[in-house]
Amino acid sequence: MASLPHCLSARPLVVAAAPGRPGPGPGPWLRGGARRRNAAFSAGNAGRRVGLRRSVASAVEVGVGEDEEEGVEEEEEEVEAVVMPERYALGGACRVLAGMPAPLGATALDGGVNFAVYSAGASAASLCLFTPDDLEADEVTEEVPLDPLFNRTGNVWHVFIEGELHNMLYGYRFDGMFAPHCGQYFDVSNVVVDPYAKAVISRGEYGVPGPGGDCWPQMAGMIPLPYSTFDWQGDLPLRYPQKDLVIYEMHLRGFTKHSSSNVEHPGTYIGAISKLDYLKELGVNCVELMPCHEFNELEYFSCSSKMNFWGYSTINFFSPMIRYSSGGIRNCGRDAINEFKTFVREAHKRGIEVIMDVVFNHTAEGNEKGPILSFRGIDNSTYYMLAPKGEFYNYSGCGNTFNCNHPVVREFIVDCLRYWVTEMHVDGFRFDLASIMTRGCSLWDPVNVYGSPVEGDMTTTGTPLATPPLIDMISNDPILGDVKLIAEAWDAGGLYQVGQFPHWKIWSEWNGKYRDIVRQFIKGTDGFAGGFAECLCGSPHLYQAGGRKPWHSINFVCAHDGFTLADLVTYNKKYNSSNGEDNRDGENHNLSWNCGEEGEFAGLSVKRLRKRQMRNFFVSLMVSQGVPMFYMGDEYGHTKGGNNNTYCHDHYVNYFRWDKKEESSDLQRFCSLMTKFRKQCESLGLADFPTAQRLHWHGHQPGKPDWSETSRFVAFSTKDETKGEIYVAFNASHLPAVVGLPERPGYRWEPLVDTGKPAPYDFLTDDLPDRAHAVHLFSHFLNSNLYPMLSYSSIILELQPDD
């Protein structure tokens, strides 16, 4: 809890005085001008004017110097100040003071709350206070006009409310030019949300419209308390080396919302805590949460029955999603904050880091037809990338583009990231469409917008920058330099930066090229053996020359975008008609293969092949250098029925099916054993790219790799500090093969993984009752340094001393 600053405590009552303003004489204060300074609340609200009579002696108390008294008549003059009415909602009388311009947001101090908000273009502003009941009724409880002389410093509007504001909410009105063609959307009829609000209150129940069926009811920010009651129980960052991570991409609501989860609060932070032990058993040590910032799941509901389930449409970046909380809007959103903190704390107790998926590329305000919620009504031309006639650049594909490299916006983003690290204890961030953060900003300056010469070149709005100020600022921040930073290194405007994202040797990337090459090779496409080998080595062709390491590559085969792992081997084309866009949405370039028949209902041989292929993909993921990431449900074969863009469905298609997990326990067992095997093998999570001294390539014969256009076989052996040596091979051909193994005198190769075998023999654990018999079946091959592989299969062998 901070103390009340001297500039506030020294000026206890009279709003006419300008705390912190240097050296004005008494004239402007006492000769009538004071009567228009913050003298009353807006019409229609319950404010009242309080007349005060004071002498020049009292003027000295509020900052008039003794030398300024000279020549002032000793006469009393009525000066107006503001005292907020004694209403139950405000817990007694409150007084209005000028406040401070920093920090931005609402800050609880001794004796009251300081409010500060940036708006360069507004001509007038007022602070709106709500009780929860008044917010639900869409009524402002109290409104405090802000005087541009006393309540504005530079482009920051500020005010200090002295008194008790417990269980109150707030927002702002801004007046100014409403001229979309000039990039301005000021509208005094709107109460907008402070971008720095730490919780945003609107609807309490997920998926339920507000009063009168309103999908966009009035929103307001939580006014913070001067103290925190949350007990972190000594929680500290885990700080795992990134090379040791196994990342699980999950949707927090979808993880436990299905009835088969059997948790007390399904679809919430608390519900997810109940299943953290499952993730630990799965071998996961990091979860990447799909968006948990405040968004409106009913964003599309007024024009269709679709839900914004995924949440990639942020309203407020500081606030955790209120309706993911079992408490909802209770306690003005503080319960939601504490539940998110509890999730992080309990994840850390189980050795699981928490990475947040953040969407700093656009907001829920959309294009010029979108709602005015926050940024647009505060300063549209600052927060959004605009064209010369006010049009919104749309590099996000969602109607607007956040103006990330604007000085004010990049400071906002860094402040937000710092908050989630220091206050919420998250371990890192995955930046959605991160290439937008490398584009040049618009400053709403005709020279800048149309292009200004920079060292002979033209830098226009949206131009990719070699050293983007925002990325530079994040990379060199003393707080953020120690957290995981992952870029989705492309955007919807055609900028693709995989392997080339500005990185400062800190940033990792979702390796989309890994995904595409591995999909091509595993399904048996010619010409990808060499590329697949590069992927197994951590993609040195992408990262080594730039000074990065294998662990800067986040390897994945499937993610929330696109097919699930099961659908990748079941469908050759997408089936997105249920999205209501005539199957036009979603990716067409899926690189999938249905294994011979389209859809779930296929013959037995096709289903067996699909099981092999899912295991092959998972093996490739776990034996590749770099950081493996897999999507929630892929470990049991979750299907979305061929829909590769399920952003709008709040039902079973996006829910983790705990009942199906039990039915598909064989695949779940295999995936869990593979993640643990990776952790046991020092050689599979190297700090640097493997060298020829450690890793050896093989073909059907040892030491003779085949990198030809028609090759569909890749194998390698690698020395390992814990396992001694392992041999890994992939046969992506439609034909079986007998593979020659490297000779190791005094040792023998012993099978561990064979995706061509039925469960549980696909992974031979030491506790398998008939393991010895299963190994013996291959002895006549292994004694000759041979191993038979089925078509479309992969194997892992371990080197053991000869008996």
UniProtKB/Swiss-Prot annotation:
Forms a homo-pentamer and a hetero-hexamer composed of five ISA1 and one ISA2. Interacts with FLO6/SIP4. The keyword Nucleus does not apply. Pathway: Glycan biosynthesis; starch biosynthesis. It comes from Oryza sativa subsp. japonica (Rice). This is Isoamylase 1, chloroplastic. Highly expressed in developing endosperm. Expressed at low levels in leaves. PANTHER family: GLYCOGEN DEBRANCHING ENZYME. The record marks D561 as: Transition state stabilizer. The active site is at D432 (nucleophile), E488 (proton donor). SMART domains: Aamy (SM00642). One of its GO terms (cellular component) is isoamylase complex. GO terms for molecular function: isoamylase activity.
